[in-house]
Amino acid sequence: SDIAQKVKQFMVDENYTPAFDSWAQKPSIGFVVAGYSSNDTFAEEYKIEVKNGNVVGPELLRGKDQVGVTWNGEPEAINRLFFGFSSTLPGVLKKKMNMTDNDIQNMVDIIRQNCTANLVFPAMPIQDAIDLARFLAYLTINYSRFSPGAPTVGGPIEIAAITKHENFKWIDRKLYFSENVNPEA
């Protein structure tokens, strides 16, 4: 999409690259660009990632005929909920079961096909999607909170909805300033 390319140009080419060009180890960053193109009935979703200065994307994650959930950051809690297993499973199978990479991939595919939670569907009401987003954010926060070590996720969350007819709309928003300086929309 043109918008995803423009976001990549602004975020990566014009800001990230000049800021970190001289660094030996560059920070990783990733973001998702999602929404409705002009005159389109269905939304699209693109992912852009920068790993140590190497850019991947914009990559089409979800086309106009697909629905789903995308998450980044601390994925473990949501991976377990949606897929039914930990992201560490392939490494455990390789180390403890001495399985080949091909056998591991086949097993992971079988588990995903049979254990993935179907929590999202095409006719899902917007309020259900909002509630699911809130649930997944708090699931991740609490998973991090109760895992050994310092919590790496927390604080107030922000939720926005993008619909064809209402466009971008804040649902839950952190207000750092008074509402006249930081308006709802």
Task: Label the model's feature ranges.
Residues 1-185:
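N-terminal nucleophile
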